[in-house]
Amino acid sequence: MTESSFKLAIVVSQFNRAVTEKLLNGVLQRLTELDVQANQIKTVWVPGAVEIPLLAKRLAKSKHYQAIVCLGAVIRGETDHYNYVCQQVSFGCQQVALEYEVPIIFGVLTTTTKEQAFARAGGERGNKGADWADAAVSMIKLMKEIEITDE
């Protein structure tokens, strides 16, 4: 994509950083392949996955970004915490998208094991970050095509 008329933000969880850094690299590499320039991208780190929706909301509310890619890795443990985190993050991201009409790309891996997460962050299953970059650019284009004017 050669037009530079859009900006996008990436919100990345620091928790499970070994995985999320790889996802971020996948997003950034794919955006570079799509001719998206560094000055069109803002990357923000949050402590954990639960904090992603709040920062996504703040970025969406600013109206500076045409899409927001949310990256995290929630890996099942021995307690029910995994279920609560997954539900809160997915619901929160969806609420932001619907409230602000900004594409929120849900790039949060929810896996049973670390091995599954690494497999999807540049391992044998590829890097899902590249897919999420494609989704962000596609949604930016679609939202421009289907703009609604207030009359």
From Swiss-Prot:
Gene Ontology cellular component list: cytosol; riboflavin synthase complex
Biological processes annotated in GO: riboflavin biosynthetic process
Binding site for 5-amino-6-(D-ribitylamino)uracil: 15, 49-51, 73-75, 106
EC number(s) recorded for this UniProt protein: 2.5.1.78
Active site: 81
Gene Ontology MF terms: 6,7-dimethyl-8-ribityllumazine synthase activity
Pfam families (alphabetical): DMRL_synthase
Enzyme class: transferase
Pathway: Cofactor biosynthesis; riboflavin biosynthesis; riboflavin from 2-hydroxy-3-oxobutyl phosphate and 5-amino-6-(D-ribitylamino)uracil: step 1/2
CDD domains per the UniProt record, alphabetical: Lumazine_synthase-I
Keywords: Riboflavin biosynthesis, Transferase
Catalytic activity of the protein: (2S)-2-hydroxy-3-oxobutyl phosphate + 5-amino-6-(D-ribitylamino)uracil = 6,7-dimethyl-8-(1-D-ribityl)lumazine + phosphate + 2 H2O + H(+)
Annotated positions binding (2S)-2-hydroxy-3-oxobutyl phosphate: 78-79, 120
Matches recorded under NCBIfam families: lumazine-synth
Entry similarity comment: Belongs to the DMRL synthase family.
Job description of the protein: Catalyzes the formation of 6,7-dimethyl-8-ribityllumazine by condensation of 5-amino-6-(D-ribitylamino)uracil with 3,4-dihydroxy-2-butanone 4-phosphate. This is the penultimate step in the biosynthesis of riboflavin.
Subunit field text: Forms an icosahedral capsid composed of 60 subunits, arranged as a dodecamer of pentamers.
Protein name: 6,7-dimethyl-8-ribityllumazine synthase
Gene responsible for this protein: ribH
